[in-house]
Curated annotation (Swiss-Prot):
Top-level taxonomic group: Bacteria
Name of this protein: Holliday junction branch migration complex subunit RuvB
Pfam families given in the database record: AAA_lid_4 (PF17864), RuvB_C (PF05491), RuvB_N (PF05496)
Keywords tagged on the record: ATP-binding, Cytoplasm, DNA damage, DNA recombination, DNA repair, DNA-binding, Hydrolase, Nucleotide-binding
PANTHER family: HOLLIDAY JUNCTION BRANCH MIGRATION COMPLEX SUBUNIT RUVB, PTHR42848
Binding site for Mg(2+): T68
Gene Ontology molecular function: ATP binding; ATP hydrolysis activity; four-way junction DNA binding; four-way junction helicase activity
Catalytic activity: ATP + H2O = ADP + phosphate + H(+)
Region (Large ATPase domain (RuvB-L)): 1-183
Gene behind the chain: ruvB
Organism: Gemmatimonas aurantiaca (strain DSM 14586 / JCM 11422 / NBRC 100505 / T-27)
Similarity field: Belongs to the RuvB family.
The organism's taxonomic lineage, starting at the top: Bacteria, Pseudomonadati, Gemmatimonadota, Gemmatimonadia, Gemmatimonadales
Length: 342
């Protein structure tokens, strides 16, 4: 694992098995996002009372905040099956026929990265979501014909990091839409302690706090940092995680006390040193640091904006006075000032 991957909120191969073992079994066990949890609890209770499927749900927000976990919990709470797929995996309408026709009454179909659905697949979904009916194409060419087929009533749960990329017709078909935000340190501490118990890690409260506050408001990052600090503790600190052990381990990984890593520093330094603090366009900035524009926009920018290091303006990205000071530069007169949220 590279140092840049340590703090990425994107799921890595090594995360998959661990996240499954840490996933809560009931909605009440889900930590954080209290307003979303309360709203979901009401929706689920109402659907059970009416003996109806829950309205189609859409979760949006940065990666690593629990969208997939919530889809799993919705199915568990309702006692129904969960079918999982993703936007990039669906290349043609026929790829959805098998999942949709195999659904039973009330089952949940989860589509991750739903903003990456092709237009033809979106249109195929419309009748499935509204009328619980799909049109199956039986042949191509002059003999082509479609046959309508009814399917069981189901709940579609979509997840996206890019709400603005969803078409208006698709968004309008979701009855429940929730934004997942970055987690406060207090919630992340609870998550770190719970993960430590599951992994049988010896850790004091200060050690858990130190990991939590450097986790970029993201549970996935918190759990990954805990595993790396555990490695350090087992090799160099008799297996016990204290504040001092966590500080030493995270310093070795180039994760500072705000949770910023090497890539964050490169991005902010490029804006300050190469573009006089900005504004600078996304594509230009990406070329300057050798990173994909989509990765910058989806993975790095949300936290930097929320934490007050970066501003998005109509003319481009601007480094804030806080970014200047954090990197040891003197902010220019009139530089953007944006307080952090954590």
């Amino acid at each position: 694992m590279s140092r840049a991957e340590i703090t990425t909120p994107e799921v890595l191969t090594e995360d998959t098995a661990v996240e499954l073992s840490l996933r809560p079994q009931r909605l009440a066990e889900f930590i954080g996002q209290s307003r979303v949890k309360e709203s979901l609890t009401i929706a689920l209770d109402a659907a059970r009372a009416r003996k109806e499927p829950v309205d189609h749900l859409l979760f949006f927000g940065p990666p690593g905040l629990g969208k997939t976990t919530l889809a799993d919990l919705i199915a568990r709470e309702l006692g129904v099956n969960l079918t999982v797929t993703s936007g990039p995996a669906l290349e043609k309408p026929g790829d959805l026929v098998a999942p949709l026709t195999s659904l039973r009454e009330g089952d949940v179909l989860f589509i991750d990265e739903i903003h990456r659905l092709r237009p033809v697949i979106e249109e195929f979904l419309y009748s499935a979501m509204e009328d619980y009916r799909i049109d199956i194409r039986l042949a191509d060419g002059p003999n082509a014909r479609t046959v309508p087929m009814n399917i069981e009533r189901f709940t579609l749960v979509g997840a996206t990091t890019r709400l603005g990329m969803l078409t208006a017709p698709l968004r309008a078909r979701f009855g429940i839409v929730h934004q997942l935000g970055f987690y406060p340190v207090e919630d992340l501490e609870v998550i770190v302690r719970r993960t430590g118990e599951v992994l049988r890690v010896e850790m004091d409260a200060d050690g858990a706090h130190e990991i939590a506050r450097r986790s970029r408001g993201t549970p996935r990052v918190a759990n990954r940092l805990l595993r790396r600090v555990r490695d350090y503790a087992e090799v160099r600190a008799n297996g016990r995680i204290t504040r001092e052990v966590a500080e030493a381990a995270l310093a070795l990984l180039d994760v500072d006390h705000f949770g910023l890593d090497d890539m964050d520093g490169r991005l902010l330094r490029a804006i300050i040193e190469k573009f006089e603090g900005g504004p600078v366009g996304l594509s230009t900035m990406a070329a300057a640091i050798g990173e994909d524009p989509g990765t910058i926009e989806e993975v790095y920018e949300p936290f930097l904006v929320q934490h007050g290091f970066l501003q998005r303006t109509p003319r481009g990205r601007v480094a804030t006075a806080r970014a200047y000071r954090h990197l040891g530069f003197v902010p220019p007169v009139g530089s953007a000032e944006q307080p952090g949220l954590f």
